[in-house]
Design a protein with these regions (language model features):
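Rossmann-like NAD(P)(H) cofactor-binding subdomain of soluble oxidoreductases
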Residues: 53, 57-154
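NAD(P)+-binding Rossmann beta1-loop-alpha1 motif at the extreme N-terminus of oxidoreductases
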Residues: 1-49
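Short, intrinsically disordered, charge-balanced linker/junction segments flanking boundaries
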Residues: 156-161
């Protein structure tokens, strides 16, 4: 299975690092070339609750076209940044790609899974202009929630609380 994690923040790095211990081929897609270079050189660095620093080597890129279509694309960005991931998601999507957004707030796809009166409605507050609803087929979505507490520290280490 080929899995791309889009977003190199605390949640994206945690999910990518955890998935790297599975047989799946994991790729972390980040926005900035300098972030890709840092992770490529140092791995994903995480501080455990006990303070131990771990380094997880991972395939990282700032060019989603370089890794091609994936079986699963996990979106790990803030809800307001989702629209900016659509070009990366397009590059990673094949006919059977499943999308799993791990975002904060009310997900844009929520009304699609509800009965009337919400069914088929677009919530403008979370999907202005219906851009996300039009770009991502709701039948290819897996809803996700995370209850993990992680933060980016100034030194590039992800602290898992």
């Amino acid at each position: 299975m080929r899995i791309a994690v889009i977003g190199g923040g605390a949640i994206g790095c945690l999910i990518a690092a955890r998935l790297s211990s599975t047989p799946a081929r994991i790729a972390l897609v980040v926005r900035r070339p300098d972030a890709a270079a840092d992770i490529r050189q140092n791995g994903i660095r995480m501080a455990t609750p006990g303070g131990r620093i771990t380094r997880t080597p991972i395939h990282v890129t700032d060019d989603p076209l370089s890794i091609g279509p994936q079986d699963l694309a996990i979106l790990c960005v803030k809800a307001y940044a989702l629209k900016g991931t659509l070009s990366a998601l397009s590059a990673l999507s094949g006919p059977d790609t499943v999308v799993m957004p791990v975002v904060n707030g009310i997900p844009w796809w929520y009304p699609a899974a509800q009965p009337a009166p919400l069914a088929g409605r677009t919530l403008a507050s979370v999907d202005p202009g219906g851009v996300l609803s039009q770009a991502i087929d709701p039948t290819r979505l897996i809803g996700a929630l995370t209850y993990v507490a992680v933060e980016n520290q100034d030194d590039g280490v992800i602290r898992h609380v």
